[in-house]
Amino acid sequence: MPLYDYGNTRLRARISKLFSFPTLESFAYLTSLDSLISQLSKTHYQDAIQIALTYAHGYGCISDALRRKLIEIQDNLRRFYDPVIWEKIKTIFLREDVKNIKSIIRGIIHKTQPRIIINSLSPLGVIPEQYTTRIAQAKNIQDAIDRMSVYQLEFAPSLLALKGSDRFASSAELERVLEFWYFSKIEQILKGSGENIDLLRKANMIEIDITNINTLLRYVDAPDSPETAGSTIEHFLIEGGSYSPKYLINLSHTNLISDVIKKLAGKKYQSYLMEALNCYQETQLLSEFENQLRIYALRWLSLLPKLSPFGVGVPMGYVALKKSEIRNIRWIAKGILSGFEPKFIIENIERIQ
């Protein structure tokens, strides 16, 4: 696939420079953030660290450098690939936009300080950062959606259509509209056939599954939640995943999370859901399931550069691997800052290969 040759060659070189797990584990034994900064400055993080050091130190320096490396991911892919190819690859980053807007909506509804909302946003989205910053500073949801409309964001009309309805101020309903817009948009982009389209569709199916499973678990855990009151689960389910909406609707009548997981676990996510269930039984946090499903998706993506070395699998895998590396460095930095034992830091390093 000639259109992918140049970009894939460049990305394979970058994949070869990613930190091995023994290297990440060695960082956990460092006794200070200054030592970690020193070590990172001798690696492919050198430029980002040097820039960050001009106006930050300690964790602030590391956080700024990691943010720069995240932004660099999309910048590189734009440069390395033909615009036609980029339109397909861009679907990876559109998901980040949806997550960012959902975070903004939740933050505004719960009256979170704009600074905190802005700091939680991923720089990997396609929407310009100055737009998301301005939206996060809105005084209320109405103002936020008006700003989305002014910036001509594609999903703004769908959100504006809710104005005047009883569900307008509902985070769950606004997020539902965003999810439906996103998956409809991806379906339009991924029309056609071929190996590359098939890979992107499989990735999209995993996202649908994760969205639907999380929706199902929230319903079972809190069927009378104010966020979902007055709506059936069918209202929130996305078509096109591994599980039919009918099957998920039937499961929503199950009383216990553990029973739902055991019925879901016969599919490809079995070991991940069961691992999450073990953790959930200790913590009672539904985020255990979301995290394990995210790990499944990252591991699937991380294999693509080897399984599909001549097409879109390389950029898909590279993005997953780089995001995971950055997440691990951030965790190690926080662990050192908090004074955690090296063993504990190492045990919680994300391993997707």
Which stretches of residues belong to each language-model region?
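N-terminal domain-start signal
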Residues: 1-353
